[in-house]
Design a protein with these regions (language model features):
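C-terminal and inter-domain tail/linker signature
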Residues: 1-148
């Protein structure tokens, strides 16, 4: 099994991560194909209809930025095989902003770790599986938090 990364895919995902960490939700439109399919979005974001779901992805990131104004997002690991990239990531911040998934700001630091499996085609993400590993960090317990 070859675990060598396609430099272009890794560059694209690295730029996406940096832009999202900076609050640039337009990165969703530049990185994800219009027919991007998330195996997570419809389940955790009621109202996300089939079709272009990039607006739902951008809204999720905007709500995370509003809840965690000091948000930092980093990619810990990227593994590439054929057209798939596996990413392990960490989102850190302090919940001092807006409510997040209905949870009022706690003022506490939060660290959310997750894993994403992304299918790449033509320099765009076309399919996604995965999400956060847990949601206890902000008191959500068993709440539906499997967002992309």
């Amino acid at each position: 099994m070859t675990l060598l990364a396609d430099p272009n895919d890794l560059r694209i995902l690295g730029a996406y991560s940096a832009r999202m960490a900076a609050g640039d939700t337009d990165a969703v439109y530049d990185t994800f194909a219009p027919d991007f399919k998330s195996h997570v979005t419809a389940r955790v974001r009621p109202g996300a209809e089939p079709g272009d779901i990039r607006p739902h992805e951008a809204t999720w990131w905007a709500s995370a930025r509003a809840a965690f104004p000091d948000m930092k997002f980093r990619v810990n690991l990227l593994v590439h095989k054929d057209d798939l990239v596996v990413s392990n990531w960490t989102l850190q911040g302090t919940h001092t902003g807006a409510p997040f998934f209905g949870v009022a700001p706690s003022g506490r630091p939060v660290e959310i770790n997750g894993t994403a499996i992304l299918r790449m085609r033509g320099g765009k993400v076309v399919e996604h599986w995965g999400g956060p590993h847990c949601s206890e960090g902000i008191g959500l317990g068993g709440a539906r938090f499997d967002a992309a």
